[in-house]
Amino acid sequence: MNGAKKNNSQRLQILTQEEIAELYGAPQFNLMERSHYFLLPEKVLHSLKIMKTNGRNTSARLWFILQYGYFKAKHQFFNISYGDAKEDVTFIMAHYLPNDPLPNQLPSRRIQGKLKSQILQWMEYSDDMSRADQLVAEKVRHFASITHGLTEIFSEVINYLESKKIVLPGYARLQDVIG
């Protein structure tokens, strides 16, 4: 991580573009990682009620498994199309939905919201951003008395949020709270 500096929008630039992409970008799994991250616990698999063919529910089930695996890996949700995650989608379809055609579109935003809530429950995480802001502000005050290194503070904040099982806030939000 580099030293912090102000960019044109007056936000502190704490991370490089590469570091931001690594932290906030969707995972890029190899085959072994797919086998691990898309492996669903029996209780989660049972709750999905996957049938021999799933009709209109195929997209919701596919999206759930995709986001479940990504969340398991990075504790965040991703706005990603099936085309952008082609290898992961192919893997999921082959392992969980082999008799269904690939859906043409993602589930509706309303259904995505419900599925995100289910994933958060299964993983015992919270996406309460006002609580995250409060915790981050407390941690920043604490670490600012120990160090002036913004990248070190940023790393500690991320570790702290993960230990509290809170979804990682967006980079701009963390920049604003840390800055």
Regions found by a protein language model. Give the residues of each.
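Long amphipathic alpha-helical coiled-coil/heptad-repeat bundle
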Residues: N2-G179
